[in-house]
């Protein structure tokens, strides 16, 4: 099996340099490609992600109920959210998949991408320690943690629209500026334009809707600073 290419670029994207690169290789290896795959690392990363996000929400929302905290955590650690992070990292470019998964477009499949993010978290923990892992996860989630609210768990597009309406501002304009890949495996690049920002904000995802949500989340972060 060929080595994974462009590892230095991926490490720069992640914000972490592995001392033991074999851990990263394993985290990127799907069970269809090798017996030494990423499922055990995924198990570990899932637990670490849960405690890091739980701790962040507990301190960020001191008056939130247990139910509110649970719903916010579920939103942040769900497969859809993890897959969005994977797409932002272009993680599909680095995955090791078996021939069948490659042929069926597994490098774009939400579940495979989400599992790989959790596996990378597990690999970083084993390569360093829990505090280093915590800082990285919080950095990856910074924009999402800034815009999440205890009530209703509205999506970023809805939250952005309500925020702009509150201040009597024009609604955002979303525009697809680029698509890439075959019809069933496309990546969408969407621009979001709002009055208060000098330039458009770009979101990239596996669907137009997800790309719009990603762009809206970034806009919310910028205008609430």
From Swiss-Prot:
GO terms for molecular function: double-stranded RNA binding; metal ion binding; ribonuclease III activity; rRNA binding. Disulfide bonds: none annotated. The active site is at residues 46, 118. It comes from the Bacteria. Keywords: Cytoplasm, Endonuclease, Hydrolase, Magnesium, Metal-binding, mRNA processing, Nuclease, RNA-binding, rRNA processing, rRNA-binding, tRNA processing. Residues 7-129 form the RNase III domain. Gene3D superfamilies: 3.30.160.20, Ribonuclease III domain. GO terms for biological process: mRNA processing; regulation of gene expression; rRNA processing; tRNA processing. The keyword Cell wall biogenesis/degradation does not apply. InterPro entries: dsRBD_dom (IPR014720), RNase_III (IPR011907), RNase_III_dom (IPR000999), RNase_III_sf (IPR036389). SMART domains: DSRM (SM00358), RIBOc (SM00535). Its EC number is 3.1.26.3. It catalyses: Endonucleolytic cleavage to 5'-phosphomonoester. It is found in: Cytoplasm. Its cofactor is Mg(2+). It holds the Pfam family dsrm. Mg(2+) binds at residues 42, 115, 118. PANTHER family: RIBONUCLEASE 3, RIBONUCLEASE III. Digests double-stranded RNA. Involved in the processing of primary rRNA transcript to yield the immediate precursors to the large and small rRNAs (23S and 16S). Processes some mRNAs, and tRNAs when they are encoded in the rRNA operon. Processes pre-crRNA and tracrRNA of type II CRISPR loci if present in the organism. This is Ribonuclease 3. It comes from Shewanella piezotolerans (strain WP3 / JCM 13877). The gene is rnc.
